[in-house]
């Protein structure tokens, strides 16, 4: 395991988050380990909406000290877990209810 400090800033806003990253034998990057607080906040956001807009992804990343890519991948993985847990009950209608529509972006 490599341990370090991830200091990311935006304008005058800075957040500092401790992280753990494991590396595989061939030097490739392995799993990201999220803190309990990060996981809790991500789960709360997922409970509110299974799909997150780019703007919201940016906001979450800033507040948790993670990259937007990490947020995007966490949500992709969490949706797959949700799909497995709900089995055949997961229909396209249910997924479309959670996915933002164009009207959400246009403001109609």
Curated annotation (Swiss-Prot):
- One MF annotation (Gene Ontology) recorded for this entry: DNA-binding transcription factor activity, RNA polymerase II-specific
Q: Which SUPFAM superfamilies match?
A: Homeodomain-like
Whereabouts does the entry annotate DNA binding, in residue ranges? 27-86
Stored InterPro entries: Antp_homeobox, HD, HD_metazoa, Homeobox_CS, Homeodomain-like_sf, HTH_motif
* Cellular component GO terms held in the UniProt record: nucleus
- Report the Pfam families cross-referenced here: Homeodomain
> Which processes are annotated in GO (biological process)?
anterior/posterior pattern specification
What are the annotated disulfide bridges?
none
Name the UniProt key words of this record, in alphabetical order.
Developmental protein, DNA-binding, Homeobox, Nucleus
Keyword hit for DNA-binding: yes
Can you say where in the cell this protein is located? Answer: Nucleus
Protein family (similarity comment): Belongs to the Antp homeobox family.
Q: What is this protein called?
A: Homeobox protein HB3
Task: Record the organism.
Answer: Tripneustes gratilla (Hawaian sea urchin)
